[in-house]
C-alpha cells in the first residue's frame, strides 16, 4: 500500500506542477530535476528499494545531472554507492575511462558520457536510475558502460516513463527489467 501511495503522490505532483512544452517535453523542475523536494525524493528512493528488494544490487549508475537526486535517494535507501556518468571529459578525470555516445531527447544533443573505471568495477550488479525514460537512449548508454565494465545490469528505473515514446518497450524487449514510478501514456495538446 505504501508504494502505491508514493506513486499516486508522484502522479498528483506531475499533474499539478508539471508543465507541458512543445515536442512532448514535460517540465517537472519544481520538484524532480531542478528544485528538489528532498523529503519526497527520499520517499521515491524508498520505493525503488522496495521494488528491487529481491535483487542483489552492488551499485547504482545514472547520468548527470537530472538523474542524480533520484539515484542518490535510491542509493541511500538501498545502502549501496551511486556513480554518475559525466557528460563531459574534465581535466580531473584520471586513469582509464568507460565511454559511450548518448543522445538526449530533451536537449536534442549527443553526448559522450564517461565513467572512471575505478568507480564501475567488474563483476558487479548495477541498477540504472534516471529521472525520465523517453526514447531509452540514456539508459541504453548506461547499459553499454556496464557492459564495458564487465558487470551486469539488473534493472532500470525512471521516475517518469513516457510510454508513448517506446524507449521502455525497447529496453524490455532486450530482457531488461524496467520499472517506472509514474507512466504517461500520452501528452496530447498539453493534456497528460
Language model features: what each stretch is:
Residues 1-129, 133-192:
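PRPP-associated nucleotide enzymes
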Amino acid at each position: 500500500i505504501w508504494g502505491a501511495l508514493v506513486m499516486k503522490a508522484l502522479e498528483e505532483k506531475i499533474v499539478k506542477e508539471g508543465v507541458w512544452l512543445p515536442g512532448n517535453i514535460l517540465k517537472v523542475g519544481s520538484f524532480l530535476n531542478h528544485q528538489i523536494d528532498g523529503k519526497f525524493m527520499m520517499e521515491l528512493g524508498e520505493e525503488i528499494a522496495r521494488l528491487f528488494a529481491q535483487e542483489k544490487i552492488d551499485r547504482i549508475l545514472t547520468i548527470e545531472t537530472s538523474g542524480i537526486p533520484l539515484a542518490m535517494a535510491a542509493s541511500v535507501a538501498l545502502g549501496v554507492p551511486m556513480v554518475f556518468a559525466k557528460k563531459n571529459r574534465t581535466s580531473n578525470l584520471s586513469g582509464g575511462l568507460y565511454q559511450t555516445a548518448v543522445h538526449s531527447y530533451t536537449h536534442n544533443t549527443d553526448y559522450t558520457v564517461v565513467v572512471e573505471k575505478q568507480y564501475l568495477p567488474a563483476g558487479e550488479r548495477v541498477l540504472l536510475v534516471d529521472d525520465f525514460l523517453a526514447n531509452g537512449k540514456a539508459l541504453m548508454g548506461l547499459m553499454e558502460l556496464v557492459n564495458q565494465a564487465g558487470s551486469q545490469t539488473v534493472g532500470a528505473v525512471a521516475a517518469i516513463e513516457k510510454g508513448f515514446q517506446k524507449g521502455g518497450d525497447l529496453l524490455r524487449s532486450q530482457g531488461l527489467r524496467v520499472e517506472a514510478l509514474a507512466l504517461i501514456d500520452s501528452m496530447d495538446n498539453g493534456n497528460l
